[in-house]
């Protein structure tokens, strides 16, 4: 699948395929999916493309990113099963009208604030989609405790994680009463955390 991107969205990377594959392994054919921080819509739309009975909601704080995601959904013929909503998980009450989901996908910001990034990434991708505090964990700390309000009983959340973050994000999940399992990417690095 090809996705349009703009400076308002992250460029989809091959590593994120680990998230989609884990989602396909974990979710039913008719799953209701929430994609948090949808950006270009790549995770949600790739999942819906592979699961014709599924439907989903992509949220993002950026209206410009949501316009890109919506256009990608239209272009890929998935617009009837994908809804895009402006919401910021750092604001109280953001989830009230969304309902519950079988599957939550999330590639949150997870880069440490002072990280040295490739100039192409730092200059051309939105900082709000990259940086998450001094340890890169701020967004996980905000999202994971809210999963109980988002998931149906037996639901699953799948997070993309950065290098060296599996143990820390797993501990955040454990503190909130969830079990976590790591999935490795094609380079054999921990890339996804499956939270139940």
Each model region followed by its residue ranges:
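Conserved beta/loop motifs at nucleotide-recognition and modification sites
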Residues: 1-2, 8-11
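Mobile active-site "lid"/loop adjacent to the S-adenosyl-L-methionine
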Residues: 108-139
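Residue-level signal for the nucleotide or nucleotide-sugar donor/cofactor binding architecture
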Residues: 10-14, 64, 68, 125, ...
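Helix-to-beta-strand junctions that scaffold the AdoMet/dcAdoMet cofactor pocket
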Residues: 78, 125, 151-153
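Generic structural signal for residues in well-ordered beta-strands
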Residues: 3, 82-84, 180
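Conserved Class I SAM-dependent methyltransferase catalytic core
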Residues: 134-195
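Short loop/edge segments at beta-strand edges and connector loops
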Residues: 5, 86-87, 161, 184
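Conserved SAM/SAH cofactor-binding pocket of Class I
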Residues: 11, 17-114, 118
């Amino acid at each position: 699948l090809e996705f349009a991107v703009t400076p308002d969205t992250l460029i989809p990377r091959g590593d994120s395929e680990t998230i989609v594959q884990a989602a396909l392994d974990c979710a039913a054919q008719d799953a209701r999916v929430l994609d948090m921080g949808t950006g270009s819509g790549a995770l949600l739309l790739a999942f819906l493309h592979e699961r014709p009975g599924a439907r989903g909601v992509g949220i993002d704080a950026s209206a410009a990113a949501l316009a890109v995601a919506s256009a990608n959904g239209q272009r890929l013929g998935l617009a009837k099963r994908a809804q895009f909503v402006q919401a910021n998980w750092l604001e109280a009450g953001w989830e009230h009208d969304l309902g519950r989901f079988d599957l939550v996908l999330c590639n949150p910001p997870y880069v440490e604030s002072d990280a040295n990034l490739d100039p192409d990434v730092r200059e051309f991708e939105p900082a709000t989609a990259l940086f998450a505090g001094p340890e890169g964990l701020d967004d996980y700390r905000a999202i994971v405790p809210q999963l109980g309000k988002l998931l149906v009983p037996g639901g699953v959340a799948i997070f993309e994680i950065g290098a060296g973050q599996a143990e820390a994000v797993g501990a955040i999940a454990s503190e909130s009463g969830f079990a976590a399992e790591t999935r490795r990417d094609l380079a054999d690095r921990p890339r996804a955390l499956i939270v139940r």
